[in-house]
């Protein structure tokens, strides 16, 4: 095994794109490792990970073999009776073999097999030096990096995410003599652009992280992240509050700075009259600042900026941040005040002139459909139908507001504030906001009953209209976000415990559509309903997979196509518990066998069991056990207590096993055969009453 040395590769660049930086760093790291692995160069990775700042991408590996392992080869040649003539001299066959091997035939070795003795050429090829392989490995890694818009600079033909300024190629204490992207490798790196003067000469790769830290650069993104969180939290505590640190904002800031330093800032209290969501969005999305909240989660007039420098005059830095945020807040306040003058109800007048979809009419048409759906759904879940209709009629009005035009992410949120200002009941104003939940993957569903009703009605109309208008998603195309709407609808129903009949709701949604897209003879309601139901189930498959539910369990329930998604969920829970029972596998296999037997039957199977035709003790015992189980589980099925149903059915295993071991189902006597089929049908129907448990059979 060859010696291993630490390896450092650093590409020093101009400021790299913030959003692309993590992906570039990971791709560079992965590409270098893949290139070494492809060439058989051993690597001790340890806890190595991608290293990066806005001005550099680096790979630091604790151990890389100095050379490839030697390559041993063996090439079989001709047998002796072909290789040598009668005088023991080489024939043309042997001479050709030796020439191809590049050696004299006398240097060839011999080996034997079942056919006799033959010549063989064995060779040992030394491995290439890793230092010689690394330039090509780096070129491959750079070429494979996901750079959406490569740049060219100077007179070079090279292209990269940003112009490359320096290159560190250090293997052990030796510089690899190579040129990449127009820059020659060296041991010289650079510190912070403003807080460190001069170059930094690295004696060895192991000096890299500490040398940069001394030069005010945290090259490890995790270290920058931890420092930012620590400093932001400390600044917020100093202000008497707590910082709002969203993951997205934090990741952006981590990739904007090399040496983060928190700066506490403030703005005029008058701006707090604006919905805090608008102010927070301005701070986070536009300026990458961290808002400070009070103990009740309300926005305060203070915020925290992250400087890429430790300033001697922090107050001046704070003034700069405050100067940047003030005009944006002033605009938001102007939009809000103007919207309040107009009023939420008046905003709705413009919806009739906004096209929702060519076949589905205007946004006003959609509002009318959603209002009717909400009014129909509300009584089924204990919500007020009058309030449901009112909330739905107002829910889209804020789309015409100045605030939402400037901050599209505030749709619904702005409507809540405007409804509250207009004196609408709190239930209605909250529902206007919650109608959009869940807004993204992993978001919470609506919490209030009215919000849940609106969320369901809105998504139901979107889905029904989309499918009726032929807008079903294909591949990556889903312009109306029907997949997201389907999952949002399903989650809201299931997680709210609403026992709604989904096919009936789909029918109501289809019936309210414009005549141009209503189901017709060629594509009737039943077809559209079935397509949409299956589409929603397909979204549920991923939902349950994310929760750790086995695909076999999902398929077992999906085969029954329960009308209620909440009922679907209860069956999923029950089948998960049933699968842990010792009887589960045997009963699943038995039900699979029953299905296969019944599938081959021609003609009608009797509905009842004739006890006078039960001849074998095992079939008598099974018939008695099945009737008892049916009696015991009827009430539990009615109550949807599927766990109890399956637990009771599990007790049938001894009788089921005995039946299949000792009874011939396809008896010669047609009456006996029909009676046994009737028994199996009764058994199979009850075993499959909660889920098609045969899916559990391996």
UniProtKB/Swiss-Prot annotation:
Q: What is its EC number?
A: 6.1.1.14
Q: Name one Pfam family in it.
A: DALR_1
Q: Which GO terms describe its biological process?
A: arginyl-tRNA aminoacylation; glycyl-tRNA aminoacylation
Which portions of this protein are annotated as coiled-coil regions?
A: none
**A single Gene Ontology CC term:** cytosol
Q: Which UniProt keywords apply?
A: Aminoacyl-tRNA synthetase, ATP-binding, Cytoplasm, Ligase, Nucleotide-binding, Protein biosynthesis
Compartments annotated for it: namely: Cytoplasm
User: What InterPro entries does its record include?
Assistant: DALR_anticod-bd (IPR008909), Gly-tRNA-synth_bsu (IPR015944), Gly-tRNA-synth_heterodimer (IPR006194)
On assembly, the entry states: Tetramer of two alpha and two beta subunits.
Stated name of the protein: Glycine--tRNA ligase beta subunit
Lineage start: Bacteria, Pseudomonadati, Pseudomonadota, Gammaproteobacteria, Lysobacterales
Gene name as annotated: glyS
């Amino acid at each position: 095994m060859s010696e291993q040395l630490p390896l450092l590769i650093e590409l020093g660049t101009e400021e790299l794109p913030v959003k692309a930086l993590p992906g570039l760093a990971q791709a560079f790291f992965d590409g270098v490792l893949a290139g070494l692995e492809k060439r058989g160069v051993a690597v001790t990775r340890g806890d190595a990970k991608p290293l990066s700042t806005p001005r550099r991408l680096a790979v630091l590996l604790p151990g890389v073999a100095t050379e490839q392992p030697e390559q041993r080869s063996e090439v079989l040649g001709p047998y002796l009776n072909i290789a040598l003539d009668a005088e023991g001299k080489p024939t043309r066959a042997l001479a050709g073999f030796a020439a191809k091997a590049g050696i004299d035939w006398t240097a060839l070795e011999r080996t034997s097999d079942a056919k006799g003795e033959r010549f063989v050429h064995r060779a040992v090829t030394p491995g290439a030096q890793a230092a010689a392989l690394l330039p090509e490995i780096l070129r491959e890694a750079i070429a494979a990096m996901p750079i959406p818009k490569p740049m060219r600079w100077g007179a070079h033909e090279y292209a990269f995410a940003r112009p490359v300024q320096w290159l560190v190629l250090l293997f052990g204490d030796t510089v690899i003599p190579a040129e990449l992207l127009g820059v020659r490798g060296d041991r010289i790196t650079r510190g912070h652009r403003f807080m460190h003067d001069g170059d930094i000469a690295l004696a060895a790769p192991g000096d890299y992280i500490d040398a940069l830290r001394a030069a005010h650069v945290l090259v490890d993104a995790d270290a920058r992240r931890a420092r930012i969180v620590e400093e932001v939290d400390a600044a917020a505590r100093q202000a008497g509050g707590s910082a709002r640190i969203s993951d997205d904002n934090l990741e952006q800031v981590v990739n904007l700075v090399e040496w983060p330093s928190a700066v506490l800032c403030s703005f005029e209290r008058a701006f707090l009259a604006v919905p805090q969501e608008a102010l927070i969005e301005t701070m986070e999305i536009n300026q990458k600042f961290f808002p400070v909240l009070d103990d009740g989660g309300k926005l305060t007039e203070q915020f925290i900026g992250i400087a890429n420098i430790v300033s001697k005059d922090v107050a001046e830095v704070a003034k700069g941040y405050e100067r940047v945020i003030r005009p944006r807040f002033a605009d938001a306040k102007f939009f809000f005040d103007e919207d309040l003058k107009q009023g939420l109800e008046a905003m709705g007048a413009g919806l009739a002139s906004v096209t929702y979809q060519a076949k589905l009419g205007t946004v006003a048409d959609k509002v009318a459909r959603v209002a009717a759906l909400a009014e129909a759904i509300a009584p089924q879940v204990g919500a007020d139908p009058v309030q449901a209709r009112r909330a739905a009629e107002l829910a889209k009005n804020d789309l015409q507001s100045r605030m939402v035009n400037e901050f599209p992410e505030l749709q619904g949120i702005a409507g809540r504030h405007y409804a509250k200002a207009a004196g609408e009941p709190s239930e209605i104003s909250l529902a206007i906001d919650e109608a959009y939940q869940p807004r993204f993957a992993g978001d919470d569903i609506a919490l209030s009953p009215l919000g849940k009703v609106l969320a369901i009605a809105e998504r139901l109309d979107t889905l029904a209209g989309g499918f009726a208008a032929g807008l079903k998603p294909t591949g990556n195309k889903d312009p109306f976000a029907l997949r997201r709407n389907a999952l949002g609808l399903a989650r809201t129903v299931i997680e709210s415990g609403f026992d709604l009949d989904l096919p009936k709701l789909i029918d109501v949604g289809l019936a309210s559509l414009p005549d141009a897209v209503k189901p017709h003879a060629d594509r009737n309601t039943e077809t559209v309903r079935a397509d949409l139901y299956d589409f929603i189930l397909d979204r549920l498959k991923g939902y349950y997979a994310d929760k750790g539910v086995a695909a076999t369990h999902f398929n077992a329930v999906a085969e029954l196509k329960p009308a209620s998604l909440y009922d679907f969920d209860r069956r999923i829970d029950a089948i998960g518990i049933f699968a842990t029972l010792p009887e589960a596998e045997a009963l699943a296999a038995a039900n699979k066998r029953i299905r296969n037997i019944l599938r081959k039957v021609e003609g009608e199977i009797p509905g009842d069991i004739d006890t006078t035709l039960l001849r074998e003790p095992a079939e008598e015992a099974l018939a008695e056990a099945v009737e008892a189980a049916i009696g015991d589980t009827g009430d539990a099925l009615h109550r949807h207590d599927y766990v109890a149903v399956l637990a009771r059915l599990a007790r049938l295993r001894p009788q089921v096993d005995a039946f299949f071991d000792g009874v011939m189902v396809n008896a010669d006597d047609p009456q006996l055969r029909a009676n046994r089929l009737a028994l199996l049908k009764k058994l199979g129907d009850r075993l499959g009453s909660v889920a098609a448990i045969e899916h559990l059979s391996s």
